[in-house]
């Protein structure tokens, strides 16, 4: 229900230079209900509700001619006001787009600093392999939640291939029990948090490569030195 996006927003707000840059987020969500929640929370409607409530509280702070002073919010209203303003500022710095409904068929030429994912447990291995494929092009981070059995019991070729990839990439794996015991879709299954940091590939300029090859061709050899 947008918890991943909300957590990223809060972490991003604490970074240096946050006020100068927008947080660009592309979402891929196959569940129509969850897509509608993302639309509501991050694509306009929530911002309008925040603005209206802030306007109502601001009116309470206007100058009161009867008491010849500015009114003050009570402690509950003041706490609400601070929270609303903080959320409003975070949303102003967020540029979120729902770009696709199926990660398996998702294609993009963008470079993503981070792919954060909570794929369906049934085929989470395929989703994570797709994320690795995307990030290997330009480098980047991956944070993925999988059913722990996907890693601990690699009984299929795809699972075995994934485990091998994770070893090659020196991925960090943390096992967590009861991570979803209090969620709306409750499950007590143990999960694995996969942490992958893929370095950017080294790319040499094609211009320098051509100059180097040209120099090798033109360089005189002992046989033709006079």
Question: Can you say where each PLM-predicted feature lies in the sequence?
Answer:
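Class I S-adenosyl-L-methionine-dependent methyltransferase catalytic core
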Residues: 1-226
């Amino acid at each position: 229900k947008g918890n991943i996006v909300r957590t990223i927003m809060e972490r991003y707000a604490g970074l240096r230079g946050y006020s100068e840059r927008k947080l660009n987020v592309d979402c891929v969500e196959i569940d129509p209900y969850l897509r509608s929640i993302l639309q509501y929370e991050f694509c306009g409607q929530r911002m309008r509700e925040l603005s209206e409530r802030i306007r109502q509280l601001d009116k309470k702070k206007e100058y009161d001619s009867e008491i010849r002073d500015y009114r003050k919010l009570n402690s509950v209203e003041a706490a609400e006001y601070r929270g609303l303003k903080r959320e409003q500022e975070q949303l102003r710095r967020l540029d979120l787009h729902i770009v696709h409904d199926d990660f398996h068929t998702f294609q993009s030429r963008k470079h993503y600093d981070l792919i954060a994912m909570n794929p369906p447990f049934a085929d989470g291995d395929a989703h994570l392999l797709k994320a690795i494929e995307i990030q290997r092009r330009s480098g980047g981070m991956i944070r993925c939640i999988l059913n722990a059995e996907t890693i601990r019991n690699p009984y299929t070729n795809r699972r075995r291939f994934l485990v091998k990839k994770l070893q090659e990439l020196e991925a960090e794996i943390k096992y967590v029990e009861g991570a979803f015991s209090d969620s709306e879709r409750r499950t007590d299954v143990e999960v694995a948090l996969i942490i992958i940091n893929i370095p950017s590939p080294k790319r040499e300029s094609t211009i320098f490569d051509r100059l180097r090859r040209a120099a090798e061709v033109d360089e005189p050899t002992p046989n033709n030195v006079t």
